[in-house]
């Protein structure tokens, strides 16, 4: 009698498991969830009861920041057969939206999301030391870091650019990509502004900053802006043009905007950098400087693998 009861229990368990697997339908199903900038729609393809493909089909998330999550999260869901994968650093809201939308798609397929959930994996540190020998290391891929890396590489100095996030651009990626053209050929010949000067730009910037700006840095920026703009437009062919709106705090026509805003600037500059042999290390955070003979001779850094 006991043996028969056990057999009955096993049969019931198998039937329940079989029913759970059969409940989810094969096909492609969509789900939507709110991201940072609005709805994110994800298409999930189910084959033989497994997640065969995940694709973001509609998103208004921030360029490059959201792109990092859009590229990684769907692939990891498929690889791990789990809706509980780790968020992408710096793109947590987009990551969560993709996972929530995928969860809704699984529900639409008749599946039970909990059956597709495994706790996120915390990868152990690899503790593998890797050394790179190069002429120049640039830390951070914002506008200034990217420009420094490109300039260095084009000047014949082998350069490595490291970025702690899984996307390029830093805070620059969130702005409109404007800069001042003071002292540039472009300002004189295209914008037809002849009354501007580094001294006037310095005065305007210090005024709007209520004289809290670092005067040394402001002086350097206003005196070097013209040559930088000419380099970007004439040499690198970055698509800058007069900004749609000239800020009222500027007493001369000097505001430029880049076509496609900052994401296009960063994409274009990074392509120039790598096309000329530059190396980029993503998710790599500088931790300390290496000194030799009283001078900085390198850096220590750690990547996402530890």
State where each predicted segment sits.
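Gram-negative bacterial Sec-dependent N-terminal signal peptides
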Residues: 1-21
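Active-site- and interface-proximal helix/loop "cap" or "latch" segments in soluble metabolic
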Residues: 23-120
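Sec-exported extracytoplasmic/periplasmic mature domains
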Residues: 78, 82, 103-111, 154, ...
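A short, basic/flexible loop-to-alpha-helix module at the beginning of a structural domain
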Residues: 115-133
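N-terminal Rossmann-like FAD-binding beta1-loop-alpha1 element of flavoenzymes
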Residues: 131-161
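Conserved N-terminal/central alpha/beta ligand/cofactor-binding core
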Residues: 167-279, 283-288, 295
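Conserved beta-strand-loop-beta-strand element in the redox core of flavoprotein oxidoreductases
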Residues: 290-306
């Amino acid at each position: 009698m006991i043996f028969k009861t056990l057999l009955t229990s096993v049969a019931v368990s198998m039937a329940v498991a079989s029913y759970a697997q059969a409940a989810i339908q094969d096909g492609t199903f969509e789900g939507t969830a709110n991201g940072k900038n609005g709805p994110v729609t994800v298409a999930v393809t189910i084959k033989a009861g497994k997640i065969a493909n995940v694709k973001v089909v509609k998103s208004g998330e921030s360029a490059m920041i959201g792109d990092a999550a859009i590229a990684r999260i769907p692939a990891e869901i498929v690889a791990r057969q789990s809706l509980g994968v780790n968020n992408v650093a710096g793109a947590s809201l987009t990551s969560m939206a993709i996972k929530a939308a995928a969860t809704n798609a699984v529900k639409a397929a008749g599946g039970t999301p909990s059956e597709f959930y495994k706790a996120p994996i915390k990868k152990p540190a690899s503790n593998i030391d890797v050394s790179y020998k190069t002429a120049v290391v640039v830390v951070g891929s914002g506008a200034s870091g990217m420009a420094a890396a490109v300039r260095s590489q084009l000047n014949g100095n082998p350069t490595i650019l490291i970025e702690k996030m899984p996307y390029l651009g830093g805070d620059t990626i969130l702005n409109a990509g404007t800069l001042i053209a003071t002292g540039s050929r472009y300002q004189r010949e295209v914008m037809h502004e002849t009354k501007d000067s580094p001294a006037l730009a310095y005065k305007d910037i210090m005024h709007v900053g209520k004289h809290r700006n670092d005067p040394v840095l402001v002086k350097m920026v206003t005196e070097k802006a013209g040559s930088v703009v000419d380099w970007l437009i004439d040499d690198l062919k970055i698509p800058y043009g007069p900004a749609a709106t000239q800020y009222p705090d500027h007493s001369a026509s000097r505001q430029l905007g880049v076509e496609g805003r900052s994401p296009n600037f960063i994409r274009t500059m990074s392509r120039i950098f790598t096309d000329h042999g530059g190396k980029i290390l993503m998710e790599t955070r500088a931790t300390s400087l290496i000194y030799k003979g009283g001078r900085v001779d390198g850096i220590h850094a750690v990547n996402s693998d530890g």
